Amino acid sequence: MRFAINLATNQNGLTGTNPSVGCVIVKNKKIISYGVTSLNGRPHAETVALKKCKNNTSKSTIYVTLEPCSHYGKTPPCTNVIIKSKVKKVYYSVEDSDLRSFNNSKKILSSKKISTKS
């Protein structure tokens, strides 16, 4: 998680109205990918990190600095991208204060048998 926080910190002020978020993907105790919210807030960190993995995320763990979004806005929900990637666990450090996502991702991911912890 510390690496994800460092990624987010380095991108502060460059993500428009979106928060700067860091994401790290770990499989078999090794970092296989990472991402950060892109310039002007899109794509989100989870999408950036998962795209780099090229479908190698089955049974992996995601560490992300903010609860993954679960609503349709200017991008599809990160929860959808996470579900399609077949990750096993998602850890996030802060719940999203946006009421469209607040605490929803835990419910959505858990319903798909993806363990979530904040």
Which residues does each predicted region cover?
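Helix-turn-helix
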Residues: 22
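A generic fold-level signal
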Residues: 16-18, 44
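Zn2+-dependent cytidine deaminase-like catalytic core
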Residues: 25-118
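Short, basic/aromatic recognition patches
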Residues: 1-16
